[in-house]
Each structure stands twice: as structure tokens, then as C-alpha cells.
Amino acid sequence: MASISSFGCFPQSTALAGTSSTTRCRTTVAARLADQSDDFAPLRSSGGNCGCVNNSGEFDRRKLLVSSVGLLIGALSYDSKDGDFASASQFADMPALKGKDYGKTKMKYPDYTETQSGLQYKDLRVGTGPIAKKGDKVVVDWDGYTIGYYGRIFEARNKTKGGSFEGDDKEFFKFTLGSNEVIPAFEEAVSGMALGGIRRIIVPPELGYPDNDYNKSGPRPMTFSGQRALDFVLRNQGLIDKTLLFDVELLKIVPN
């Protein structure tokens, strides 16, 4: 639910399969933006304040979080190597791209580390505690976004990132490293993290949910709306890039 204003206008993409294909592509994008205009309308209070402030004058943390993620998604679409915005075709699996690396992101972000598997990660905060390793049971807090589809959020915790963790892990996600309980990207990202760290990962489809089904491997969205948003992206064949973005905070390690 990131604000579309953070993306700015979609740049014109180069021709994919002739002029007519390019025109259809642009028309489709424009139609989608029109359909989504209500969802992405700027939030304003009756007094003209920013939508991150409620009627009582207090900051609305959820709106502030979503706005910051919107800025991130906009930044991710910027290719700093040649100074141009990435074309829309790099984020969407257009029909003209079938058979040409289907479903894989074309973007490599210079401030992220890319592993041999294709996972890209960036430590937002380096932990100072012990390192998680295979066999350990870990407790994490996580956010998830469909960066291939308007940067929509499908999971967000209502807890302040970086706050103290007092041992009550009932509402947090927990799994055992090496048990194949989670998608490969989650397993790889958490392995080697230090306790207290926060890691942002960009997940290509091949490291995501098997068979495009979030019920087969964790983490699973906890809300119906989150499940719908993720399911729509995973099951929509031929139109949407399935690249995902996760923020993972390592809260607790129970050694094997």
C-alpha cells in the first residue's frame, strides 16, 4: 500500500516487440494506475496536515511506515549506474518477455550484496549478539512487500522496529534453521545474522514460495488482506513480476 506518489511517473520503456506492443504496454500500465487511483490517493487530514498525523495531532506509525517504504521502492527503481530510472519492463513480466528469463528481476542494486544464489541483501542494522546457525531455533519480526506490483505490503507488525524484546514470542514468527520450514531466501538471510540485526532482502521468484503457494513454506501473512495481496501476485501468470522484499529482524536465538 505504498503511495504511488513515491514512484513518480512510470518512465517510457523501450520497444519490446514492435511499436504496437509498446503502445499496448503503456496503455495497460495507464489503465492499472487509473484503477488503483483510489487506493493511492494522498492521505490528508481535515486541517491540511500530512496523512501521517491523525486528528489528535499524533503521528500515525503505520502510515509513516508505509510512506517510508514507498520512498524505498521509488529508490529501488533508480539505476544509479547510468543515472536513469529503470524501465517498467524490468519490474513486470510482460507477454513479450515470455521465454526470456521469466519472472526474474533485471535489477542489481549497487548498495546491496548479492549472494551466489541471486539473493540481494543489505544490513539496515548489524546485530551485536551471537550468530544464528543451522539447527538453532530463531524468532524474527518481519515485513513483506510485493515490489513487482506497486510495492504493496502483505505483512507488517505493529511493533516498533529496534525495540526491546522481552521474551514473549507468541506473536512473532519462529522456525528452526535448516529444517526447510521457510522459503530459501529466508533461510539464507537469517543464517549468519547476529542477534538484534535487521536485514533487508530482495527475493527473486526462484528463492521465494514454492509452486507460488505461501501455504507450503513460511513466512505466511497473518491477515486475510495480506494473504490476498500475496496470493494475487504469486498466482497471476504472465503479467506480474514476483520479486518480493522482506525486512527481517532477528529477535531471539535458541541454540540447538
Swiss-Prot record:
GO terms for molecular function: peptidyl-prolyl cis-trans isomerase activity. It is an enzyme of class 5 (isomerase). The keyword Plastid applies. Residues 135-254 form the PPIase FKBP-type domain. The modification Phosphoserine is found at residue 164. It catalyses: [protein]-peptidylproline (omega=180) = [protein]-peptidylproline (omega=0). Residues 1-29, 30-88 form a transit peptide. Its EC number is 5.2.1.8. Disulfide bonds: none annotated. Its main location: plastid. One of its GO terms (cellular component) is chloroplast. Keywords: Chloroplast, Isomerase, Phosphoprotein, Plastid, Rotamase, Thylakoid, Transit peptide. It holds the Pfam family FKBP_C. It is found in: Plastid, Chloroplast thylakoid lumen. InterPro entries: FKBP19-like, PPIase_dom_sf, PPIase_FKBP_dom. Belongs to the FKBP-type PPIase family. PPIases accelerate the folding of proteins. It catalyzes the cis-trans isomerization of proline imidic peptide bonds in oligopeptides. This is Peptidyl-prolyl cis-trans isomerase FKBP19, chloroplastic. It comes from Arabidopsis thaliana. The gene is FKBP19.
